[in-house]
């Protein structure tokens, strides 16, 4: 399941974030790569311990945890804190699958979901599409600055070469309360249906019943 979430940050907020990020020191992006991925990756990143990157990462996580669509789709349990990358001058990241486990200062994170928050407007660079292969085929993603795409970490994906301009983004992984992607999809569809019926003032008893089904399935499938 691939979900696009528009306007996580406003244009003005993105501009403020970019001013801070652009002023930092960017390094070789292979510090987060596995052995296989490192042969396909050419980009730049901020150091994971950069204080500005850490501060903005906290802001991103807080914003996402307060976003109803993100919470409904991801059922987040634990984040691997956001990192920041930049592509320019032909830089690219060939097809790869993200590492299954990431280590943080607080322990291990199983990467159930990957997310990219775009921080460059699509008309300011050529190339740089996030191409994701999933059960519905190949999808090419290039969103407006401030918008985010969320997708299963099991997906084969790449960032195509940036042939002009500059593509800056935040990327992150998270462990979901529900490990299985198919179960997460069913819960998301059910939750979205409940919200839609609520907005349509559906009969109260039917909403109670559906909400009960949702929570009982979540109770059955969640791992905490």
Swiss-Prot record:
Q: List the disulfide bonds.
A: none
The entry marks the following residues as binding 2-oxoglutarate, namely 167
The protein's GO terms of the molecular function aspect are: 2-oxoglutarate-dependent dioxygenase activity; iron ion binding; L-ascorbic acid binding
Question: At which positions is Fe cation bound?
Answer: 96, 98, 157
What SUPFAM superfamilies does the annotation carry? Clavaminate synthase-like (SSF51197)
Q: Which UniProt keywords apply?
A: Dioxygenase, Iron, Metal-binding, Oxidoreductase, Vitamin C
| InterPro entries listed in its UniProt record | Oxoglu/Fe-dep_dioxygenase_dom, PKHD_C, PKHD_hydroxylase, Pro_4_hyd_alph, Pro_4_hyd_alph_FE2OG_OXY
Residue limits of the Fe2OG dioxygenase domain?
A: 78-176
Annotated membrane-spanning segments are none
Per its UniProt record, the required cofactor names are: Fe(2+); L-ascorbate
According to its UniProt record, this protein's enzyme class is: oxidoreductase
Task: Supply one GO BP term.
Answer: intracellular iron ion homeostasis
Listed Pfam families? 2OG-FeII_Oxy_3, PKHD_C
Free-text remark on how the cofactor is bound: Binds 1 Fe(2+) ion per subunit.
The keyword 4Fe-4S belongs to this UniProt entry's keyword annotation = no
What is this protein's record name? PKHD-type hydroxylase Shewana3_0717
């Amino acid at each position: 399941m691939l979900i696009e979430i528009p306007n996580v940050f406003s244009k003005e907020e993105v501009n403020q974030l970019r001013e801070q990020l652009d002023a930092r020191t960017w390094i070789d992006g292979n510090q987060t790569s596995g052995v296989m991925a490192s042969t396909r990756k050419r980009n730049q990143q901020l150091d994971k311990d950069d204080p500005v990157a850490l501060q903005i990462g906290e802001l991103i996580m807080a914003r996402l945890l307060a976003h109803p669509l993100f919470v409904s789709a991801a059922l987040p349990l634990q984040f691997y804190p956001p990192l920041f990358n930049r592509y320019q001058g032909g830089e690219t990241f060939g097809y790869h699958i993200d590492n299954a486990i990431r280590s943080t200062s607080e322990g291990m994170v199983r990467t159930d979901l990957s997310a990219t928050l775009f921080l460059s407007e699509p008309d300011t660079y050529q190339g740089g599409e996030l191409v994701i292969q999933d059960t519905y085929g190949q999808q090419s993603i290039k969103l407006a600055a401030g918008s985010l795409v969320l997708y299963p970490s099991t997906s084969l994906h790449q960032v195509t070469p940036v042939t002009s301009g500059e593509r800056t983004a935040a990327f992150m992984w998270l462990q979901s309360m529900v490990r299985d992607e198919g179960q997460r999809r069913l819960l998301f569809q059910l939750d979205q249906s409940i919200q839609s019926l609520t907005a349509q003032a559906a009969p109260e008893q039917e909403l109670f019943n559906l909400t009960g089904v949702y929570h009982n399935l979540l109770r059955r499938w969640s791992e905490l």
